C-alpha cells in the first residue's frame, strides 16, 4: 500500500525534534521489533520531515493476522500518512497481560527512531486488535499510553470490564457491527462502560452520518462515541476518514 504525502505547518507551536536525532527513514520500513521480538512495520508520509513531531497511530492485529494483513484489511496507510500520521502495524500474538504490556511499548520504540509527538499517540485495531486497544487504555500498567482510542469488533463486554477500574477520562470511539455473531452486543456494552468512566450522561444522542452516537457532557470535554455498523465480525468498518478526524480532534494522553 502506498504512503501519502502530507502538508506540513511550520509555525512556532509545532513540536520538533533536533536535526539528526531520529534515524528512521521516510516511507515504508519493515521488520522492526520489540525487545521480545514482536515484529512491526512503520509507515511515514512520503515527504517525512524528521524535525517535525508527528502523531502516531498504532493498528493492532486481529487474531491470526500479521502486520501486512492488518495494513491491507484496514486500508489506513495512504490516508493516514497523507494527513501527517506515522502508522505502526504489529503482528498478532495471543493476548495475555505480558503480551499487552509488550504491545504497549511500540509507541516508545517508534519514537526512538522517528519524530513523534508523544501527546498524540492513538490506538486502533480489529477484533483481538480492538481488545488490545481497549486493554492498553485501561490496564494499570499501560494506561496513559494513548491520547484517544478507536477499538473495532473488540471481544470485551460489560462483565469483563467490571473487573477493572476506570482510567482518567479518555476520548473513545467504539466501532462494532450489529451483525457481529462472534461478540454480539459487546461494543454497545463497552461504550456504556467507557461513557460511565468518562462521566458522561448515560443517554447518547442521535446517530450521525456514520451511524455513531455520542454520549454528551463527558468529563474534561472528551468524546465518547459508539458507532454501529452492519458488516461481519471480520470486516473493518468503512469509516477511516471519521476515525482519523476523531484522532485529530484529540491530543494529550491522560496518565
Name these PLM-found stretches.
Residues 173-175, 182-188, 197-255:
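C-terminal catalytic histidine-bearing segment of alpha/beta-hydrolase fold enzymes
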Residues 115-127:
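Alpha/beta-hydrolase fold nucleophile elbow
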Residues 59-62, 89, 174:
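Structural cue for short, hydrophobic secondary-structure segments
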Residues 51-63:
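Short beta-strand element of the alpha/beta-hydrolase
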Residues 69-88:
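Short amphipathic alpha-helix adjacent to the substrate-entry channel of hydrolases
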Residues 95-118, 135:
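Alpha/beta-hydrolase active-site loop
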Residues 1-54, 126-150, 156, 204-217, ...:
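A domain-start/cap signature at the N-terminus of enzymes
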Residues 92, 149-157, 177-179:
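Active-site nucleophile loop of the alpha/beta-hydrolase fold
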Amino acid at each position: 500500500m502506498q504512503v501519502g504525502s502530507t502538508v506540513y505547518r511550520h509555525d512556532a507551536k509545532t513540536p520538533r525534534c533536533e536535526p539528526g536525532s531520529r534515524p528512521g527513514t521516510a516511507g515504508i520500513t519493515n521488520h522492526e521489533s520489540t525487545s521480545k521480538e514482536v515484529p512491526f512495520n512503520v509507515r511515514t508520509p512520503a515527504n517525512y520531515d524528521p524535525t517535525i513531531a508527528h502523531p502516531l497511530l498504532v493498528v493492532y492485529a486481529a487474531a491470526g493476522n500479521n502486520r501486512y494483513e492488518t495494513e491491507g484489511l484496514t486500508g489506513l496507510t495512504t490516508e493516514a500518512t497523507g494527513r501527517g500520521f506515522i502508522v505502526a502495524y504489529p503482528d498478532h500474538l495471543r493476548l495475555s497481560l505480558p503480551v499487552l504490556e509488550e504491545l504497549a511499548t511500540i509507541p516508545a520504540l517508534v519514537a526512538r527512531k522517528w519524530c513523534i509527538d508523544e501527546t498524540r499517540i492513538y490506538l486502533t485495531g480489529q477484533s483481538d486488535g480492538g481488545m488490545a486497544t481497549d486493554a492498553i487504555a485501561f490496564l494499570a500498567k499501560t494506561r496513559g499510553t494513548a491520547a484517544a482510542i478507536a477499538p473495532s469488533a473488540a471481544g470485551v463486554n460489560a462483565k469483563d470490564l467490571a473487573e477493572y477500574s476506570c482510567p482518567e477520562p479518555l476520548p473513545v470511539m467504539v466501532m462494532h457491527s450489529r451483525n457481529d455473531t462472534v461478540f454480539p452486543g459487546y461494543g454497545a456494552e463497552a461504550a456504556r462502560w467507557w461513557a460511565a468512566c468518562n462521566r458522561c450522561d448515560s443517554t447518547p444522542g442521535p446517530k450521525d452520518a456514520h451511524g455513531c452516537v455520542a454520549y454528551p457532557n463527558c468529563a474534561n470535554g472528551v468524546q465518547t462515541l459508539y458507532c454501529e455498523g452492519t458488516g461481519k465480525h471480520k470486516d473493518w468498518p468503512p469509516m477511516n476518514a471519521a476515525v482519523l478526524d476523531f484522532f485529530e480532534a484529540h491530543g494529550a494522553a491522560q496518565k
